[in-house]
Amino acid sequence: MNAPKPVVLCILDGWGLSDDKTANAPYLAKTPTFDAIMTKGPHARLITHGPDVGLPSGQMGNSEVGHTNIGAGRVVAMDLGQIDLAIEDGSFFDNAALRDFIARTRAAGGTAHLMGLVSDGGVHGHLNHIIAAAQAITNAGVPVVMHAITDGRDVAPKSAYGFMAELEDRLPKGARIVTVTGRYFALDRDNRWERVQEAYDAMVRGEGRRVSTAHSAIDYAYNQSESDEFITASVLTGYDGMRDGDSLFCLNFRADRAREILRAIGEPGFADFDTGARPALSALLGMVEYSDAHNAYMTTVFPKRDIVNTLGAWVARHGLRQFRLAETEKYPHVTFFLNGGKEEAEPGEDRFMPKSPKVATYDMQPEMSAPEVTDKFVEAIGAGYDLIVTNYANPDMVGHTGDLKAAIKACEAVDQGLSRVIAALEQAGGAMIVTADHGNCEMMIDPETGGPHTAHTLNPVPVALVGGPAGVTLRDGRLSDLAPTVLALMGLPKPPEMTGESLIT
């Protein structure tokens, strides 16, 4: 039997499965196409958290982890666990890059600036890592100031008081908090430079909303109806910015949301907004590598590990053509992360990236750019590609707003797109795996607080096969089983590095 063409992997980002229907956007939405996929064809469930995706037990998955595991076809040990272990066994404190950072700062007579997400969400960073870094640096006699980025997205929307109190309690002598900024500003990833500039001005220039303490920054924000994610850049009394000879250590271990603020601080010739005269920093260090471009002006504590023979690399090695599609919010996931942290496209790999809508939050436009994604998706199905990988961002990005009605609309927008995609797929004679990278919008109300739930979940995600071989079924599995399944549909062997197994039975 001939292999179907194209073979499609469609990722509904943040679309989880839950038996609790109370605030379950996919369940409450009118999704006739998805419902038909899950009732008429082969379907199963995938685990997206904890050791099954290379994370510590109980740690929720996320889009970076999910797409990395999907593309690798094997369980990839993620940075969170590696960093935790290095702190636990003491090797973090002896790391050569960290020691060099300390030596350069001390030689310049500077202050070490730490920047990181202050929560235990474990998606972009972790409070424990901030404390370890502060201890290592202050133990060497170098003063430390902390640029605290509040979360409210991977943890409860108004949990900053507790995390800030823990940070203040655990910071060693010689370290203090000097700015408090919501991640909406400091961790943008969609070229909203006006947001990034607010964070930059506070951290680098010491300009922003003036407050006396970190807690008063949160107080003021809550009085202005700003939840943690949206806290206006606030500068504590006595801080007036970075100086020549100072240094910066970014503690975030996920690349996509750290890139823009680091570019503004360190990239030679940066011109996306007026930074003013930037200080001559003695050192710029990252917990991980953020991109090849960042490597030109930063060092790293944990260099990138090569993931060889990813799905994309293996398909390219067999001389086949592939297409990657997502709007800008999720574009790095179907390219950089799916390709194992590699920026460049594989030979024969084409890409398209519709711009995400320019709105303050995506509950204001829950359809996002799904119509344009679908237009290009349908076009690609008829264009002769062997493999197509598409990500619909809506369930995750709107799920993060905590707005149930908007999340329902987001799911419905995706379902409308799926209807058109399946029609095109049937006409072309292709096959498609529909799945998700983690849960989110199936839990829009926090069961503990009764308030909005904005974080990812530990729930399983769907996996379904459309247009596959007759009579097959799918088994339950994990994300690393998806690439071997795709290769099986394409009639290709899997590379020896892929330890995942095809879901088709």
Swiss-Prot record:
EC number: 5.4.2.12
Residue positions of the active site: 63 (phosphoserine intermediate)
Residues spanning the signal sequence: none
Record keywords, A-Z: Glycolysis, Isomerase, Manganese, Metal-binding
GO biological process: glucose catabolic process; glycolytic process
The protein's annotated pathway: Carbohydrate degradation; glycolysis; pyruvate from D-glyceraldehyde 3-phosphate: step 3/5
Molecular function terms from GO: manganese ion binding; phosphoglycerate mutase activity
Reactions this protein catalyses: (2R)-2-phosphoglycerate = (2R)-3-phosphoglycerate
Cofactor note as given: Binds 2 manganese ions per subunit.
Gene Ontology cellular component list: cytosol
Binding-site residues, substrate: 124, 153-154, 183, 189, 254-257, 330
Cofactor(s) named in the record: Mn(2+)
Positions contributing to Mn(2+) 2 binding: 13, 63, 437-438
NCBIfam families named among the record's database cross-references: pgm_bpd_ind
Subunit architecture: Monomer.
Family: Belongs to the BPG-independent phosphoglycerate mutase family.
Protein name: 2,3-bisphosphoglycerate-independent phosphoglycerate mutase
Organism encoding this protein: Ruegeria pomeroyi (strain ATCC 700808 / DSM 15171 / DSS-3) (Silicibacter pomeroyi)
